[in-house]
């Protein structure tokens, strides 16, 4: 039998804003933080519980017993009022998570709101400064080992640099517990541990051309990112992680904020809302597909495909530093299209073929399941219909120039 307080809670759920999770926006929240006065989903409730009862006191709407004072608090606040308070000064560059986003993004969003109160106190948003210095574990280009590297972000120079740390600090287990990143140093006011590093950077990445995405499932670490950029006309991937989820999220946000500021300088008359749409996005889709060359005698090869906005890249393995090939997907009005093939292709694993048609050639691809093919067709079709941006045109010109000037290694090869 439903008691009086539970009936009141169900009525409160019908008020505007209360019918979705206050943190991730998922429908039908069945939990609440009664001291904060918000309705939340089960996933976010577990994060609230992890912050401790001194920050958030969590109860199930139906399974727990509610006191009158707790219900009154829910009535006084609610999701809309709580958002107005705890999200008052969210920077435009900050990525607001949704229910399908990585755990680290949702968790740090919640902790930033209620634990650190970053959006009530803008001075705590150090990722807006345009500079950041710290250490991340980086995967080797030629091997799978992760080594400690110093990273330096400088918005004024439009660069993200990284360089070797000393051999004595090459393992996460020993050094990451002793190294204080930029955010920690600002609070401590002094550096207790020093790390020697080479003066010359090992790599210099252009922030304005850099894409960054969380990659926990691919890298196998909850607090990990993939950095993607063009190097000598080809795409380069860098994989990094940090043991502290707050640190990796701050790096992610600092890169987004720096990129937005650079876009505002480059396109001063473009509305900020349009520029935000150009900030780094997660890959539209990744996964295994079968690929074959244009000749009937060509064999099917299993490749890891990644769709990054308009670049469809394929690799031998998911964590390769470079793709084996890259296909630019232009607008459908320029001769690009996707076709479903229902004919057999001679490969029992590649049961669901489809063709990506470009002005230069047709790429013969295949998925293992009907559902997987449908997923790829959907995201590629979206890319075909989307108008090209100036960045898209730059990438297209770079890839075409690479294709026409390189005879030994072609990014449009049949590999």
Regions from the language model: what does each represent?
Residues 1-17, 93-94, 107, 114-120, ...:
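Long, non-globular segments of proteins
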Residues 1-13, 42-126:
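Cys/His-rich, Zn2+-coordinating zinc-finger modules
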Residues 3, 11-18, 34-35, 65, ...:
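Intrinsic disorder
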Residues 21-24, 41:
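Short cysteine-rich clusters marking metal-coordination/redox-active sites
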Residues 112-129, 154-235, 241-277, 282, 308-362, 383-396, ...:
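Pleckstrin homology
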Residues 128-131, 259-322, 328-329, 333-348, ...:
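Disordered regulatory linkers adjacent to lipid/PI-binding modules
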């Amino acid at each position: 039998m439903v008691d009086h307080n539970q009936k009141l809670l169900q009525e409160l759920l019908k008020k505007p804003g209360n019918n979705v999770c206050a943190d991730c926006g998922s429908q039908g929240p069945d939990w609440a933080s009664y001291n904060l006065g918000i309705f939340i989903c089960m996933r976010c409730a577990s994060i609230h519980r992890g912050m401790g009862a001194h920050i958030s006191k969590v109860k199930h709407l139906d399974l727990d017993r509610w006191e009158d004072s707790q219900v009154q608090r829910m009535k006084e606040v609610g999701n809309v009022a709580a958002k107005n308070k705890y999200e008052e000064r969210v920077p435009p560059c900050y990525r607001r998570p949704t229910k399908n986003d990585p755990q680290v993004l949702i968790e740090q969003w919640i902790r930033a709101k209620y634990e650190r109160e970053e959006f009530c106190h803008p001075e705590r948003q150090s990722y807006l400064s345009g500079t950041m210095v710290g250490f991340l574990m980086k995967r080797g280009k030629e091997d799978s080992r992760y080594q400690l590297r110093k990273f330096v972000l400088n918005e004024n120079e439009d660069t993200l640099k990284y360089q070797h740390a000393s051999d004595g600090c090459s393992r996460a287990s020993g050094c990451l517990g002793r190294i204080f990143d930029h955010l920690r140093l600002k609070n401590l006011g002094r550096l207790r541990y020093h790390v020697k590093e080479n003066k010359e950077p090992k790599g210099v990445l252009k922030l304005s051309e850099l894409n960054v995405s969380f990659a926990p499932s691919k890298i196998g670490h909850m607090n990990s990112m993939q950095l993607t950029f063009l190097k000598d006309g080809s795409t380069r991937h860098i994989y990094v992680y940090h043991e502290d989820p707050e640190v990796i999220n701050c790096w992610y946000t600092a890169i987004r904020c720096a990129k937005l500021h650079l876009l505002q300088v480059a396109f001063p008359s473009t509305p900020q809302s349009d520029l935000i749409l150009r900030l780094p996005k997660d890959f539209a889709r990744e996964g295994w597909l079968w690929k074959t060359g244009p000749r009937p005698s060509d064999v099917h090869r299993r490749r890891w495909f990644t769709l990054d906005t308009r670049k469809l890249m394929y690799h031998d393995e998911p964590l390769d530093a470079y793709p084996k090939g890259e296909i630019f997907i232009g607008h459908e009005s320029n001769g690009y299209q996707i076709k479903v093939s229902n004919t057999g292709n001679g490969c029992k694993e590649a049961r669901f073929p489809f063709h990506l048609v470009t002005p230069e050639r047709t790429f013969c691809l295949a998925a293992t399941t009907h559902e997987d093919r449908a997923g790829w067709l959907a995201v590629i079709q979206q890319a075909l219909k989307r108008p090209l941006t100036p960045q898209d045109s730059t990438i297209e010109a770079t890839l075409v120039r690479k294709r026409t000037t390189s005879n030994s290694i072609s990014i449009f090869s049949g590999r």
